[in-house]
Swiss-Prot record:
GO terms for cellular component: cytosolic large ribosomal subunit
Organism per entry: Thermotoga maritima (strain ATCC 43589 / DSM 3109 / JCM 10099 / NBRC 100826 / MSB8)
Assembly: Part of the 50S ribosomal subunit. Contacts protein L32.
Name of the featured protein: Large ribosomal subunit protein bL17
Gene: rplQ
Keywords annotated in UniProt: Ribonucleoprotein, Ribosomal protein
PANTHER family membership: LARGE RIBOSOMAL SUBUNIT PROTEIN BL17M, RIBOSOMAL PROTEIN L17
Record keyword Metal-binding present: no
Length: 131
């Protein structure tokens, strides 16, 4: 039974949805924030939280084999070793003490052409995690 099993389908078939989330995650790792529709932003938030959690584990684990395994998993999603290194070595270091909520979704209004609700998706700063 599929009770309470939810997935953001985004009106796309599986491989298209996977490709979309991979592309959006690449952009957010590279630029730090992006503007997209709210539905895509909500789907991206869960996707990126899982990716950053893997990056944190890869950055903090003492087991070299586990670290390499996690880096390879992240690289399979991002498809670019430079972005993988940036995520693990630079971004993940800021979130070591944090247990989730690495990505923020802020609604910013409606798109002019079709009135789709737009959101700003950004990585949460490390300084704001204290408190």
């Amino acid at each position: 039974m599929r009770h309470r099993v939810k997935r953001h389908k985004l009106g796309r078939y599986g491989s298209h949805r996977k490709s979309l989330l991979r592309n959006l995650s690449r952009e957010i790792v590279e630029h730090g924030s992006i503007v997209t529709t709210t539905a895509k932003a909500k789907a991206l938030k869960t996707f990126m939280d899982k990716l950053v959690s893997k990056a944190i584990e890869a950055a903090t684990t003492d087991d070299r084999a586990r670290s390499v395994h996690l880096r390879r998993q992240i690289n399979a999603v991002l498809g670019d070793r430079r972005l993988t290194n940036k995520l693990v070595d630079e971004i993940a270091k800021n979130y070591v003490g944090r247990r989730g909520g690495y990505v923020r979704v802020l609604r910013i209004g409606f798109r002019r052409g079709d009135a789709a609700e737009m959101s700003l998706v950004q990585l949460v700063e490390a300084s704001s995690q204290e408190g």
